Amino acid sequence: MQKKSQDMKKQAIVVIDSIHELQRFSEFFEMGLGQYIFRGQKRSAWNILTSLERHEEGEKCKYWGSNTGQKPGGIHLTRYLAATGCSNEYEEILRFSDTWEKDYGVRLDDLTSAALRRHFGCPSRLLDVSKSFDVALYFAYEGKNTKEDSAIWAICVDQISGRAERIFSMAKERFGDVDWENRLVKELLCSEKIYEKMPFVLPVGAMNHVPWMIAQKGMFLMPLSKCFMQSLAYTLSGHPALQVATMSAEQFLNGDQKNFPLVKFVLSHQIDNEVGDLLSEKNLTKKRIFPDEKPIWVDHLKLKVTFQ
Protein backbone atom coordinates (compact mmCIF):
# COMPACT_ATOMS: atom_id res chain seq x y z
CA MET A 1 0.00 0.00 0.00
CA GLN A 2 2.81 2.36 0.86
CA LYS A 3 4.59 1.68 -2.41
CA LYS A 4 1.40 2.43 -4.33
CA SER A 5 1.12 5.78 -2.58
CA GLN A 6 4.74 6.61 -3.39
CA ASP A 7 4.25 5.69 -7.04
CA MET A 8 1.11 7.78 -7.40
CA LYS A 9 1.47 10.62 -9.86
CA LYS A 10 0.76 14.13 -8.64
CA GLN A 11 0.19 16.34 -11.68
CA ALA A 12 -1.15 15.66 -15.15
CA ILE A 13 -0.87 17.86 -18.23
CA VAL A 14 -3.60 17.59 -20.86
CA VAL A 15 -3.27 19.53 -24.13
CA ILE A 16 -6.55 20.64 -25.71
CA ASP A 17 -6.09 21.62 -29.34
CA SER A 18 -9.60 21.35 -30.76
CA ILE A 19 -12.87 23.05 -29.88
CA HIS A 20 -14.56 19.65 -29.92
CA GLU A 21 -12.30 18.40 -27.12
CA LEU A 22 -12.89 21.59 -25.15
CA GLN A 23 -16.65 21.17 -25.42
CA ARG A 24 -16.35 17.59 -24.19
CA PHE A 25 -14.44 18.73 -21.10
CA SER A 26 -16.98 21.48 -20.48
CA GLU A 27 -19.82 18.95 -20.55
CA PHE A 28 -17.83 16.47 -18.44
CA PHE A 29 -17.21 18.93 -15.61
CA GLU A 30 -20.46 20.86 -15.77
CA MET A 31 -22.34 17.58 -15.29
CA GLY A 32 -20.51 17.20 -11.99
CA LEU A 33 -18.34 14.29 -13.08
CA GLY A 34 -15.48 14.86 -10.69
CA GLN A 35 -15.15 17.14 -7.67
CA TYR A 36 -12.84 19.84 -8.98
CA ILE A 37 -12.23 23.53 -8.54
CA PHE A 38 -10.73 25.42 -11.47
CA ARG A 39 -8.51 28.41 -12.21
CA GLY A 40 -8.28 29.95 -15.68
CA GLN A 41 -5.06 31.68 -16.73
CA LYS A 42 -4.22 33.60 -19.90
CA ARG A 43 -0.71 32.14 -20.03
CA SER A 44 -0.03 28.44 -19.64
CA ALA A 45 3.53 29.25 -18.50
CA TRP A 46 2.23 30.80 -15.29
CA ASN A 47 2.33 28.85 -12.05
CA ILE A 48 -0.86 28.35 -10.06
CA LEU A 49 -0.93 31.56 -8.08
CA THR A 50 -3.56 34.17 -7.40
CA SER A 51 -3.71 37.21 -9.66
CA LEU A 52 -2.72 39.35 -6.71
CA GLU A 53 0.39 37.32 -5.91
CA ARG A 54 1.42 37.07 -9.55
CA HIS A 55 1.19 40.81 -10.08
CA GLU A 56 3.25 41.46 -6.96
CA GLU A 57 6.04 39.05 -7.82
CA GLY A 58 5.87 38.69 -11.59
CA GLU A 59 7.11 35.41 -12.98
CA LYS A 60 9.75 34.98 -10.27
CA CYS A 61 7.17 33.67 -7.83
CA LYS A 62 7.26 29.88 -7.55
CA TYR A 63 4.33 27.61 -6.79
CA TRP A 64 6.32 25.67 -4.17
CA GLY A 65 6.87 28.51 -1.74
CA SER A 66 7.61 32.20 -1.97
CA ASN A 67 10.91 34.02 -2.36
CA THR A 68 9.56 37.24 -0.90
CA GLY A 69 9.31 38.78 2.50
CA GLN A 70 6.13 39.71 4.28
CA LYS A 71 4.49 42.97 3.22
CA PRO A 72 1.34 44.65 4.50
CA GLY A 73 -1.77 43.50 2.68
CA GLY A 74 -2.70 47.07 1.81
CA ILE A 75 0.47 47.54 -0.25
CA HIS A 76 -0.23 44.38 -2.22
CA LEU A 77 -3.83 45.34 -2.75
CA THR A 78 -3.32 48.97 -3.72
CA ARG A 79 -0.61 48.13 -6.24
CA TYR A 80 -2.65 45.35 -7.81
CA LEU A 81 -5.91 47.30 -8.08
CA ALA A 82 -4.14 50.35 -9.52
CA ALA A 83 -2.43 48.23 -12.17
CA THR A 84 -5.70 46.59 -13.18
CA GLY A 85 -7.69 49.82 -13.38
CA CYS A 86 -9.74 49.04 -10.26
CA SER A 87 -8.62 51.86 -7.96
CA ASN A 88 -12.21 52.63 -7.02
CA GLU A 89 -12.54 49.13 -5.60
CA TYR A 90 -9.87 49.88 -3.00
CA GLU A 91 -11.89 52.88 -1.78
CA GLU A 92 -14.90 50.58 -1.43
CA ILE A 93 -12.79 48.07 0.50
CA LEU A 94 -11.73 50.76 2.96
CA ARG A 95 -15.35 51.88 3.34
CA PHE A 96 -16.34 48.28 4.03
CA SER A 97 -13.61 48.01 6.69
CA ASP A 98 -14.83 51.20 8.35
CA THR A 99 -18.40 49.89 8.49
CA TRP A 100 -17.28 46.52 9.84
CA GLU A 101 -15.13 48.11 12.54
CA LYS A 102 -17.99 50.39 13.58
CA ASP A 103 -20.46 47.49 13.83
CA TYR A 104 -18.23 44.78 15.32
CA GLY A 105 -15.29 46.60 16.91
CA VAL A 106 -12.73 44.69 14.80
CA ARG A 107 -10.55 46.24 12.09
CA LEU A 108 -10.15 43.89 9.11
CA ASP A 109 -6.93 43.75 7.12
CA ASP A 110 -7.39 44.74 3.49
CA LEU A 111 -7.28 41.24 2.01
CA THR A 112 -9.83 39.90 4.46
CA SER A 113 -12.04 42.91 3.83
CA ALA A 114 -11.83 42.39 0.07
CA ALA A 115 -12.78 38.74 0.39
CA LEU A 116 -15.72 39.48 2.67
CA ARG A 117 -17.00 42.15 0.28
CA ARG A 118 -17.08 39.58 -2.49
CA HIS A 119 -18.77 37.16 -0.15
CA PHE A 120 -21.55 39.68 0.30
CA GLY A 121 -22.05 40.06 -3.45
CA CYS A 122 -19.60 42.77 -4.53
CA PRO A 123 -17.75 42.22 -7.83
CA SER A 124 -14.01 41.65 -7.48
CA ARG A 125 -11.11 40.42 -9.61
CA LEU A 126 -8.85 39.49 -6.73
CA LEU A 127 -9.10 35.75 -7.27
CA ASP A 128 -10.71 33.82 -10.09
CA VAL A 129 -11.06 30.25 -8.84
CA SER A 130 -14.38 28.55 -9.46
CA LYS A 131 -16.29 25.31 -9.15
CA SER A 132 -17.30 25.90 -12.77
CA PHE A 133 -15.02 24.83 -15.64
CA ASP A 134 -16.82 27.31 -17.89
CA VAL A 135 -16.19 30.23 -15.52
CA ALA A 136 -12.49 29.31 -15.45
CA LEU A 137 -12.57 29.20 -19.25
CA TYR A 138 -13.86 32.76 -19.23
CA PHE A 139 -10.92 33.92 -17.12
CA ALA A 140 -8.46 32.04 -19.33
CA TYR A 141 -9.50 34.24 -22.25
CA GLU A 142 -10.74 37.49 -20.70
CA GLY A 143 -8.71 40.34 -22.21
CA LYS A 144 -6.28 37.97 -23.93
CA ASN A 145 -4.48 39.62 -26.86
CA THR A 146 -1.42 37.43 -27.41
CA LYS A 147 -0.85 34.30 -29.44
CA GLU A 148 0.08 32.18 -26.44
CA ASP A 149 -1.48 29.05 -25.03
CA SER A 150 -3.87 29.54 -22.12
CA ALA A 151 -4.45 27.12 -19.27
CA ILE A 152 -7.05 25.89 -16.83
CA TRP A 153 -5.80 24.34 -13.59
CA ALA A 154 -8.07 21.71 -12.04
CA ILE A 155 -7.69 20.73 -8.38
CA CYS A 156 -9.45 17.52 -7.37
CA VAL A 157 -11.19 18.17 -4.07
CA ASP A 158 -11.99 14.51 -3.42
CA GLN A 159 -8.33 13.49 -3.52
CA ILE A 160 -6.94 16.26 -1.35
CA SER A 161 -9.73 16.65 1.22
CA GLY A 162 -8.75 13.68 3.42
CA ARG A 163 -5.17 14.75 3.83
CA ALA A 164 -6.17 18.39 4.19
CA GLU A 165 -8.46 17.51 7.08
CA ARG A 166 -5.62 15.63 8.79
CA ILE A 167 -3.30 18.60 8.30
CA PHE A 168 -5.77 21.07 9.80
CA SER A 169 -6.54 18.66 12.64
CA MET A 170 -2.85 18.36 13.50
CA ALA A 171 -2.46 22.14 13.28
CA LYS A 172 -5.36 22.64 15.67
CA GLU A 173 -3.86 20.20 18.17
CA ARG A 174 -0.53 21.97 17.96
CA PHE A 175 -1.67 25.59 18.03
CA GLY A 176 -4.96 25.32 19.91
CA ASP A 177 -8.14 26.97 18.75
CA VAL A 178 -8.13 28.82 15.44
CA ASP A 179 -7.94 32.61 15.49
CA TRP A 180 -10.98 34.87 15.28
CA GLU A 181 -10.66 35.31 11.50
CA ASN A 182 -11.08 31.60 10.86
CA ARG A 183 -14.02 31.42 13.26
CA LEU A 184 -15.60 34.35 11.47
CA VAL A 185 -15.25 32.76 8.05
CA LYS A 186 -16.70 29.50 9.33
CA GLU A 187 -19.68 31.45 10.61
CA LEU A 188 -20.17 33.17 7.27
CA LEU A 189 -19.99 29.89 5.39
CA CYS A 190 -23.24 28.92 7.11
CA SER A 191 -25.12 31.98 5.84
CA GLU A 192 -26.53 30.28 2.75
CA LYS A 193 -29.51 32.61 2.42
CA ILE A 194 -27.36 35.44 1.03
CA TYR A 195 -26.62 33.35 -2.08
CA GLU A 196 -30.13 33.39 -3.51
CA LYS A 197 -29.95 36.32 -5.94
CA MET A 198 -26.60 35.63 -7.60
CA PRO A 199 -26.05 33.41 -10.65
CA PHE A 200 -23.05 31.31 -9.63
CA VAL A 201 -23.94 30.16 -6.13
CA LEU A 202 -22.92 26.63 -5.24
CA PRO A 203 -22.84 24.97 -1.81
CA VAL A 204 -19.52 24.97 -0.02
CA GLY A 205 -19.76 21.19 0.24
CA ALA A 206 -16.46 19.35 0.21
CA MET A 207 -14.43 22.55 0.46
CA ASN A 208 -15.45 23.33 4.04
CA HIS A 209 -12.26 21.69 5.32
CA VAL A 210 -10.40 24.85 4.25
CA PRO A 211 -11.44 27.21 7.05
CA TRP A 212 -10.32 30.47 5.41
CA MET A 213 -11.97 29.81 2.06
CA ILE A 214 -15.11 31.75 1.24
CA ALA A 215 -17.48 30.59 -1.51
CA GLN A 216 -19.54 33.05 -3.49
CA LYS A 217 -21.48 32.21 -6.62
CA GLY A 218 -19.30 29.25 -7.44
CA MET A 219 -16.26 31.51 -7.12
CA PHE A 220 -13.79 31.19 -4.28
CA LEU A 221 -12.08 34.05 -2.53
CA MET A 222 -9.51 33.60 0.19
CA PRO A 223 -8.46 36.42 2.51
CA LEU A 224 -5.22 34.53 3.13
CA SER A 225 -4.66 33.16 -0.36
CA LYS A 226 -0.95 32.48 0.05
CA CYS A 227 -1.70 30.26 3.04
CA PHE A 228 -4.10 28.25 0.91
CA MET A 229 -1.58 27.77 -1.89
CA GLN A 230 1.06 26.66 0.57
CA SER A 231 -1.29 24.21 2.30
CA LEU A 232 -2.34 22.88 -1.09
CA ALA A 233 1.30 22.27 -1.92
CA TYR A 234 1.79 20.24 1.24
CA THR A 235 -1.46 18.42 0.57
CA LEU A 236 -0.50 17.35 -2.93
CA SER A 237 2.97 16.20 -2.02
CA GLY A 238 5.26 15.86 0.99
CA HIS A 239 8.17 17.36 -0.95
CA PRO A 240 8.56 20.19 -3.50
CA ALA A 241 9.04 17.95 -6.54
CA LEU A 242 5.84 17.14 -8.42
CA GLN A 243 5.66 13.98 -10.46
CA VAL A 244 4.28 15.13 -13.82
CA ALA A 245 2.69 13.00 -16.51
CA THR A 246 1.25 14.01 -19.87
CA MET A 247 -1.98 12.39 -20.98
CA SER A 248 -4.39 12.74 -23.88
CA ALA A 249 -7.91 14.09 -23.61
CA GLU A 250 -9.27 10.59 -24.18
CA GLN A 251 -7.16 9.14 -21.38
CA PHE A 252 -8.44 11.75 -18.93
CA LEU A 253 -12.08 11.38 -19.91
CA ASN A 254 -11.81 7.59 -19.69
CA GLY A 255 -10.83 7.72 -16.03
CA ASP A 256 -7.04 7.97 -16.02
CA GLN A 257 -7.28 11.21 -14.02
CA LYS A 258 -7.87 9.36 -10.75
CA ASN A 259 -4.23 9.44 -9.66
CA PHE A 260 -3.79 13.15 -10.35
CA PRO A 261 -4.96 15.62 -7.70
CA LEU A 262 -3.67 18.48 -9.87
CA VAL A 263 -4.34 18.74 -13.61
CA LYS A 264 -3.21 21.46 -15.99
CA PHE A 265 -5.24 21.80 -19.17
CA VAL A 266 -3.19 23.61 -21.80
CA LEU A 267 -5.48 25.36 -24.30
CA SER A 268 -3.85 25.85 -27.70
CA HIS A 269 -3.91 29.43 -28.97
CA GLN A 270 -4.93 28.05 -32.37
CA ILE A 271 -8.52 27.67 -31.12
CA ASP A 272 -8.78 31.15 -29.57
CA ASN A 273 -11.38 32.41 -32.06
CA GLU A 274 -13.53 29.32 -31.64
CA VAL A 275 -13.33 29.64 -27.85
CA GLY A 276 -14.59 33.21 -28.13
CA ASP A 277 -17.60 31.95 -30.07
CA LEU A 278 -18.17 29.22 -27.46
CA LEU A 279 -18.14 31.73 -24.60
CA SER A 280 -20.67 33.88 -26.44
CA GLU A 281 -22.84 30.84 -27.05
CA LYS A 282 -22.78 30.01 -23.33
CA ASN A 283 -23.46 33.66 -22.43
CA LEU A 284 -20.30 33.79 -20.32
CA THR A 285 -19.79 37.54 -20.34
CA LYS A 286 -18.23 40.10 -18.03
CA LYS A 287 -21.68 41.29 -16.98
CA ARG A 288 -22.68 37.78 -15.96
CA ILE A 289 -19.46 36.97 -14.12
CA PHE A 290 -19.41 40.33 -12.34
CA PRO A 291 -23.09 41.32 -11.97
CA ASP A 292 -23.50 45.05 -12.51
CA GLU A 293 -25.76 45.42 -9.50
CA LYS A 294 -25.78 47.71 -6.52
CA PRO A 295 -23.58 46.12 -3.84
CA ILE A 296 -25.71 44.27 -1.33
CA TRP A 297 -23.14 43.86 1.46
CA VAL A 298 -24.48 46.71 3.60
CA ASP A 299 -27.70 44.85 4.40
CA HIS A 300 -25.86 41.63 5.11
CA LEU A 301 -23.59 43.28 7.64
CA LYS A 302 -26.60 43.27 9.92
CA LEU A 303 -26.53 39.47 10.07
CA LYS A 304 -25.61 38.28 13.55
CA VAL A 305 -22.00 37.15 13.63
CA THR A 306 -20.65 35.31 16.64
CA PHE A 307 -17.10 34.38 17.55
CA GLN A 308 -17.85 31.24 19.55
Please identify what each model-predicted range represents.
Residues 1-308:
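Catalytic-core elements of nucleic-acid end-processing and repair enzymes
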